[in-house]
Amino acid sequence: MSWLFFSVATAILWGAAELFYKKGALPNEKYSHLKICVCVGAVMGAHAIFTLLTKDIGYNPINLLVYLPVSLLYIVSMAFSYFGMRFLEESISDPIENTSGAICSLLCVILLKETLTPLSVVAILIIVVGVVGVGYLENNGDTQRKKTLGKKLAIIAFCMPFIYALLDAFGSFVDIFYLDDFASTPLIGVTEDTIEDVANTSYELTFALFALGLFIFMKAKKVKFAPIPQHKDKILAAIFETAGQFTYVYALSGNGVIAAPIISSVCVVSLLLSRIFLKEKLSWKTYTFIAVVIIGILLLAVSEEL
């Protein structure tokens, strides 16, 4: 039953990561979202080096370039997410971001001519209803965010999780061509046993280089960096994110049919943690539509594994 432990651990770790991302994304700190990227890149880079030193995956550095399209889609999507977290409640942003799986399914139907099961169609429709409901309440209601940020910035902030979902979905879609079959993958020198490690290491090293570039950019702009202890929330978020990636692989390798919906419950974990630790409180109407989104995501996770 180790897969069950890893499944629950993944949901908790990623839920905790979302909590600390939100705590580290300070609205009054102009470059806080970029500083989070630097922290995540540093931790992922360290994990990539650890993988290369402890595992014989036959890594070819050219795979950094080969896997670059996927890596960039994932990295840029996360940067948009971190920006949105500065102004948007985690209770709203996380369920919307997790609709990326539904978008990826639609891309497969449209571009690869794949078919959806009736349950998948129902799940996607439920997600759409929930997202439209949240969007309607956010843009037509008299929210505190509009009063605090102004209408323009409030709308921009609300768009961030949607941009994340789109970019992450395209990243997952393109990832199919890299990871679906090791015999036809563009990745160089991989086997059935090493293909996922090679892809993940390429992603983590790219994130580390991206983080280094952002660090140099901010130094050139004379952005002030507080002592490391003051960045503890950003660092903890990066650690939980990377740890969740580790447990995720082992969870799906055991019993993917049950593991997938458990992992998808990260939305619920994030919602609970935000309510408990961040004291986020939304209207009952908004919570209702968020619940609809979460139900749709869980149904989609189940339908994809049946």
Regions found by a protein language model. Give the residues of each.
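Hydrophobic transmembrane alpha-helices of multi-pass small-molecule transport proteins
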Residues: V43, A48, S105-V109, L119-N139, ...
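Membrane-embedded alpha-helical core segments of multi-pass
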Residues: L13, A17, L73-F80, S100-L107, ...
